[in-house]
């Protein structure tokens, strides 16, 4: 494996568990331990534990912290109460996507921005440039990515596995997109514990100091063993998020896509009362209406759609697949794809070009999967 790839503090433990390691966003990460399908089903039916320490964390604090976040975020962080978490996007002036992020409001003037691993350096430079241009000096911006590790415990049994180990929080009272501080898990002090995730299931994300994560990982795996908890890799993380229609940077969103065509308009607040980068372009797109739309596709003919495969209507290529795979939950071959709005209605028949063959498919409702366990 390339020596320049970064490793999380759990690298040796992944190898001990038999993980297959792959490069991802500049990191050497576990793609699977047993099998993607087995790990995927564990999360849907019981629970899975993910090492997502490759994600980036920026702390913004000080009197102008909110001003900076409002400038770079499409969402309205002024409506974010202390102890809550908000999904948002950062956009370029033309409305395309720099990254999608989570904003954590830890205190009155203290926030975290959690960014995608492969975008950490780009995002850091982009936010710093925005700050300089706006002359926002009454704040501190700190890259804490190297000192923070992150585990995601996901699935319907996540709460019952975690609660006996946790002191300082009653998990049944922690709402989705809420956070708790001063929580200890199996003797490990956490920095932040939130009811968030990227699987479409109920679950928690646990932020700890990098030096504490190995003890937490082992304690959680041991505690959840009887309930069917499995360590899970990036393969299952991708199929889980994809079934729930959660976007992945470089697939559904990128500097070639805007949030409105991606179906993320709920996180774009054009009337939040302050200007933000990309606002004018997004206002124009909203007024005119997007020309294309992200849709779900289900294969009728046999074949597995993959990213980049063309989508055609009546033999003419009109769009392309952003993510495609066999769905372990639905046991069908499905895809997300961008197509012109005229061909985006549910039930529309399309073809996916797989290895030169036009295979029949249809546009279906999304998300492909909604958890019966989510709160």
Curated annotation (Swiss-Prot):
CC terms in the record's Gene Ontology section: cytosol; glycine cleavage complex
One GO MF term attached to the UniProt entry: transaminase activity
Coiled coil ranges: none
InterPro entries recorded: GCS_T (IPR006223), GCS_T_bac (IPR022903), GCST_C (IPR013977), GCV_T_N (IPR006222), GcvT/YgfZ/DmdA (IPR028896), GcvT/YgfZ_C (IPR029043), TrmE/GcvT_dom1 (IPR027266)
Gene3D superfamilies reported in the protein's UniProt record: Aminomethyltransferase beta-barrel domains, Aminomethyltransferase fragment, Probable tRNA modification gtpase trme, domain 1
Top enzyme class: transferase
Alphabetic keyword roster: Aminotransferase, Transferase
Catalytic activity of the protein: N(6)-[(R)-S(8)-aminomethyldihydrolipoyl]-L-lysyl-[protein] + (6S)-5,6,7,8-tetrahydrofolate = N(6)-[(R)-dihydrolipoyl]-L-lysyl-[protein] + (6R)-5,10-methylene-5,6,7,8-tetrahydrofolate + NH4(+)
Any one of the GO BP annotations: glycine decarboxylation via glycine cleavage system
Pfam families: GCV_T, GCV_T_C
Domain of life per record: Bacteria
EC numbers on record: 2.1.2.10
Role according to the record: The glycine cleavage system catalyzes the degradation of glycine.
Homology family: Belongs to the GcvT family.
Subunit structure: The glycine cleavage system is composed of four proteins: P, T, L and H.
Name under which the protein is recorded: Aminomethyltransferase
Organism, scientific name: Symbiobacterium thermophilum (strain DSM 24528 / JCM 14929 / IAM 14863 / T)
